[in-house]
């Protein structure tokens, strides 16, 4: 379970959800445990003690002295930035001493490798990206379930991977397929993780304070791929396509792309438009329409020039999730499931079934022919751009909050194209106002979200949407993005009551 180490001494840094999962896993396997957190009494300390886990706890600043006493592995919680000076010094000291530094994902990869010696060989699918991870992960899990597989969905989406694995072992119900949502934080410490197929949905500016630069952030995303992992890539995103192999050599990893245009390479996915209807399609070689995609791709790699046709899968409008960005998410999920040879028919039925996740371009009410859309999970610029372009209708946008140092310039074009007006809230409203001034779209500042919602309702016309997609974090005004969504919903409910409508 720990490489070539038997019951090692493990130092767990950070007692969040992943840190607690690492501690549980290590205790389960007889490791000696030292747990450190910069907080003297982190919330999960009580849970640790209640479960009777035998561990030394050290509160306060991290120092290299935490490695003393024979520490062999450092278990690093994903919320801890490697750029933080005290942590950087500790990690450097660990490297000098030959102490392994793993995150939860590496513990999970090592555990699967150990279980593999007993014959357990599940398929592993992994999803990352700045936006759309949770939707695509949940949808991929559903697709696999509807194909008759026993599925575990875990990771950034919760539950923690190690907790889910432990419960599966205890219940003697190990899944056929693991579907993992992975953040850049979790991938930063990946070393031997090698899923069967993995998708990068998009890469836009986010968490730059944690990673230090956009390039470092993108490189962390790329750690989702092992040497033989099928790569599912968004061909509309240049940063993502940097992970496509330069040459389709015989030993190159298989690559499948998806996008919002017609695919031109055999086995890729996209959208095709005909008589005003958008279709989800797969590019197929007319010479081998019934062969498996892997076989068709071997032909292409051998200098075969395919005669490409667009095989219609289903109308995009048959999806219950709104927006073109969700059509892209659906294509990514379908591509992942097909990469492990699941049959297409049940996958297509499941695509029609999936209703989406809360707070992600979720239509919560329609009042006087105006849609009220909760995208409170849109905590970065890329998410809001995707929501605006995906809805593709006139919108009164509500944006603002803690901008996390982002560049808001990518909002200019979609705001100019789609927005009737923009209501601004939160700490970085002035920064967004300055950026959007050139659009000529009316901009209004509001002290509260409730005031912004009521003002947006007054401006919206039939056929419009009032969209909460802040492009910012929520903590300057709210407990979290879910609390922000609750306030939005309450304001919409009040409008419905005022108008005598049912939200």
Swiss-Prot record:
SUPFAM superfamilies: MurCD N-terminal domain, MurD-like peptide ligases, catalytic domain, MurD-like peptide ligases, peptide-binding domain. The keyword Cytoplasm applies. ATP binds at residues 129-135. Pfam families: Mur_ligase_C, Mur_ligase_M, MurD-like_N. It is found in: Cytoplasm. GO terms for cellular component: cytoplasm. One of its GO terms (biological process) is cell division. Keywords: ATP-binding, Cell cycle, Cell division, Cell shape, Cell wall biogenesis/degradation, Cytoplasm, Ligase, Nucleotide-binding, Peptidoglycan synthesis. It comes from the Bacteria. GO terms for molecular function: ATP binding; UDP-N-acetylmuramoylalanine-D-glutamate ligase activity. Belongs to the MurCDEF family. Cell wall formation. Catalyzes the addition of glutamate to the nucleotide precursor UDP-N-acetylmuramoyl-L-alanine (UMA). This is UDP-N-acetylmuramoylalanine--D-glutamate ligase. The lineage of its organism: Bacteria, Pseudomonadati, Pseudomonadota, Betaproteobacteria, Burkholderiales. The gene is murD.
């Amino acid at each position: 379970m720990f490489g070539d180490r038997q019951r090692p001494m493990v130092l767990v840094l950070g007692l969040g959800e992943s840190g607690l999962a690492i501690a549980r896993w290590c205790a389960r396997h007889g490791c000696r445990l030292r747990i450190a957190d910069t907080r003297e009494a982190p919330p999960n300390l009580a849970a640790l003690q209640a479960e009777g886990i035998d561990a030394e706890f050290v509160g306060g600043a991290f120092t290299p002295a935490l490695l003393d006493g024979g520490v062999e592995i450092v278990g690093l919680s994903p919320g801890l930035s490697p750029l933080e000076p005290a942590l950087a010094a500790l990690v450097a000291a660990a490297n000098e001493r030959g102490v392994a530094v793993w995150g939860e994902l590496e513990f999970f990869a090592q555990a699967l490798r150990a279980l593999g010696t007993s014959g357990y060989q599940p398929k592993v699918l992994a999803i990352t990206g700045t936006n759309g991870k949770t939707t695509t992960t949940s949808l991929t899990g559903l697709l696999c379930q509807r194909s008759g597989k026993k599925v575990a969905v875990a990771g950034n989406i919760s539950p923690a991977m190690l907790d889910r694995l432990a419960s599966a072992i205890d219940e003697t119900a190990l899944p056929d397929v693991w579907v993992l949502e992975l953040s850049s934080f979790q991938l930063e410490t990946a070393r031997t993780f090698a899923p069967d197929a993995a998708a990068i949905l998009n890469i836009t500016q986010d968490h730059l304070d944690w990673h230090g630069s956009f390039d470092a952030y993108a490189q962390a995303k790329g750690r989702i791929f092992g040497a033989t992992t099928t790569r599912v890539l968004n061909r509309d995103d240049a940063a993502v396509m940097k992970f496509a192999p330069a040459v389709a050599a015989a030993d190159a990893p298989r690559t499948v792309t998806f996008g919002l245009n017609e695919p031109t390479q055999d086995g890729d996915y996209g959208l095709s438009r005909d008589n005003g209807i958008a279709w989800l399609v797969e590019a197929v070689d007319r010479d081998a329409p019934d062969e498996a995609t892997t076989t068709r791709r071997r032909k292409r790699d051998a200098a075969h020039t395919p005669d490409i046709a667009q095989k219609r899968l289903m109308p995009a409008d048959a999806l219950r999730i709104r927006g073109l960005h969700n059509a892209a998410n659906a294509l990514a999920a379908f591509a992942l499931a097909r990469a492990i040879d699941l049959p297409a028919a049940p996958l297509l039925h499941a695509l029609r079934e999936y209703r989406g996740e809360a707070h992600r371009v979720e239509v919560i009410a329609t009042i006087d022919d105006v849609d009220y859309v909760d995208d409170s999970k849109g905590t970065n610029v890329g998410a809001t751009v995707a929501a605006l372009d995906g809805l593709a209708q006139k919108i009164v946008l509500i944006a603002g909050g803690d901008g996390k140092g982002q560049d808001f310039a990518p909002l200019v074009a979609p705001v100019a194209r789609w927005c009737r007006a923009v209501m601004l809230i939160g700490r970085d409203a002035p920064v967004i106002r300055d950026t959007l001034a050139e659009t000529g779209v009316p901009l209004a500042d509001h002290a509260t979200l409730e005031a912004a919602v009521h003002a947006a309702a007054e401006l919206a016309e039939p056929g419009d949407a009032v969209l909460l997609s802040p492009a910012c974090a929520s903590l300057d005004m709210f407990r979290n993005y879910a609390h922000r969504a609750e306030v939005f919903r309450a304001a919409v409910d009040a409008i419905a009551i005022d108008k005598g409508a049912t939200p």
